[in-house]
Amino acid sequence: PNMVTSGSTASEQANISLVAEKTVECLQNSLPDDLPAVTFLSGGQSDIDSTAHLDEMNKISSNPWKLSFSYGRALQQAALKSWSGNVENETAAQEVFSHRAKMNKLAALGEWESSLEN
């Protein structure tokens, strides 16, 4: 599923805590506790926002399910931009991809911090 976020054209965007709270609330009201996991799509969110939201969901609640990611664009976008079709940029792009994967792994464990992005 996607996370509960504000519409892309909304003049006011929900903060990280509100997105996490409303997404977890929605899951608690609609999913059985014996479901093993929920994996989220990034749903058009930025790389950092999708990571921050996942991390916050894992921090605010002891959920009966594992909350993780199934991101495509949110994992690949920065790496593709770094690569830009230039073979000379392959190593840098791989490092960018590896970093995003690591950040999302930490978010799935509720261990991500924004300072790790610098």
Where in the sequence are the language-model features?
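Active-site capping/gating regions of soluble enzymes
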Residues: 1-118
